[in-house]
Amino acid sequence: MKKQQFVFILLLLLPFTGCKSVVKDTVVEPVVQVEKRQTGVLFERKVNGKWEWHEVGDETKDHKYVGKIENGKPHGRGKITFADGEQYVGKFKDGQKHGQGTLTTPDRDRYVGKFWHGEKHGQGTLTTPNGDKYVGRFYHGKKHVQGIYTFGKGEWGGQKYVGEYKDGKYHGRGTYTWSDGRKY
C-alpha cells in the first residue's frame, strides 16, 4: 500500500519535473541618440557643386544663417541672408526653408507663406514693389491650382485674375476683370 501511494505521488509530481522555467535577468538599455542643438551662426557655400553648411565663412560671399541649429544645420526658427541680399526669416528643417516663413528678394518682391524642402509650396502671398499681389497656392515654387492675381500700378493697374494656375501660368477656368469692370 505504501508502495502504491509512493508511485501515485510520483505520478502526480511527474508533470512538474523537467519543466523548468528559466527567467534570465536581461537588462535592456535604451539607445539614446544625442542631438547637438544650439543657437548660433552658420555659413552656406557651394563646395564641388554641392551646398554645404560651415561654422566659419565670408559674409560677402557666403549665405549667412542666424538661428536654431541641430546637427550642424539650420533647424527651427532662423534668418538667412543670401550673398545677393535676398533674405528669409522663418522655419527651417534639415538645413532648408521648411514651414511658415517670409522671403524678400533684392528687388523687394516679398513672399509670405509655406515652404517645403526649400521651395514655396502651399498657401502663400506674393507681392511686388509695384503693388502686384498673388494670393493662392504654390507647388514647387510656382503658382499652382487656385489663386487671385491683382495688378498694382502701371498699364494693367487695377486688373484682376481669379482662377486656376498650372506651373506658374494661367491654366483652366478663371475670370479676368479689367479695371473698367469688363470681364472675360
Locate each region found by the language model.
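Glycine/tyrosine- and acidic-biased, solvent-exposed loop/turn segments at the edges of beta-strands
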Residues: 18-184
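Classical Sec-dependent N-terminal signal peptides that target proteins to the secretory pathway
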Residues: 2-21
